[in-house]
Amino acid sequence: MYKRQGQGIGNFGDASCFSFHATKVFNTIEGGAVCYRDPDMGRRLYELKNFGIHGPEEVDAVGANAKMNEFCAAMGLCNLRHVDEEIAKRRAVAERYREHLEGVDGLRLNVQQPEVRSNYAYFPVVFDENLFGASRNEVMDALAQNGIGARKYFYPLTNTFECFHGKYDVDATPVALHVAKRVLTLPLYADLSMEDVDRICKIVLEQKL
């Protein structure tokens, strides 16, 4: 989503992080941003993005070079003009998917809430193998055999990565774990044709027993 009850999501919470990676609905090729309310947090973030430098001869923390370069910023300004058009096209694709897949036994789509305005970044489908008759992985393989890439967003869970082994309790996120084992994100981008959406859905539904 990018708006809730008419407010941009950057207005909620202490801070909101945005990715502007090339795969996002709005991108600057690479980069991101943080929105914040507390001026002290803003000063701290500014220092951390600039190697942790606090003053001419003072470094308070280990920081990074997280400043956006001018080329990426210029690309963002160019893309900003087209973001509404991009979202509208993505919405049409998502609605076409829903025409085919909504109400199918064993498929769960994200709930559309009236007070939320989506940016249609992804189209995730949660598969119930017992009801649908095929697992998420089997459907993904069938799509791949037809030259269609689908992603297991997001699998595996971050707290199951080997680098975090023993640091986080995997059992503390049972809902996320349940969904991660069953979710498949179907292709969604502004220039995806309705014919291709129909073909993707046909292949998905052909796996149903």
Residue spans of the language-model regions?
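Conserved catalytic cysteine-centered active-site region
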Residues: G8
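Active-site PLP attachment segment
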Residues: N11-E47, E70
